[in-house]
Amino acid sequence: MKQYKYDDIEALQALISEEFSDWSSEVEITQDLVNQFAELTGDDYWLHTDPEKAKTGSPFGCTVAHGFLTLVLLPKMISEQAWEVVGFNNMLNYGSDKLRFTGVVPVGCSIHSRGRVKEISATPKGTKVVLETHVHVVGQDERPALIYELIFIYM
């Protein structure tokens, strides 16, 4: 695995690419998983939790995962990277500039993700890294269900 020192902006900028990584491992979306998320968050809307009603009342014909459930599953789908950032004391999750739920994730499907380095820049606090990640329903790889830009600051 190639290592990049967190404050070597020029070397890190070589990671910026329009090309996405290989697909991550797959995560199965089960009704039990959706129900647990609904209980945890209090979002028990029938579109997510009532398979019988969703068969006839939903435009999708089934229950679907919460958009935020899809988002929080990202750490389970991290693909193996060919590089790592080293030499920093702290790494902060600085937030996101973009989050879009662009497709439906039906219960019973599997999802996977892939990403790319979108931006590297120096800031007064450290090195900012913007990662763009797309989550897709397996077998529907032409259109993502989720687009997310995650920002880290390495200090």
Locate predicted features:
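HotDog/MaoC-like acyl-thioester-processing domains
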Residues: 1-18, 105-155
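Hot-dog-fold acyl-thioester-processing enzymes
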Residues: 1-93
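Hydrophobic alpha-helical segments
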Residues: 44, 81, 103, 132-133
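Short, surface-exposed secondary-structure edge patches
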Residues: 61, 102-103
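Short alpha-helix capping/helix-loop boundary micro-motifs
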Residues: 96-101
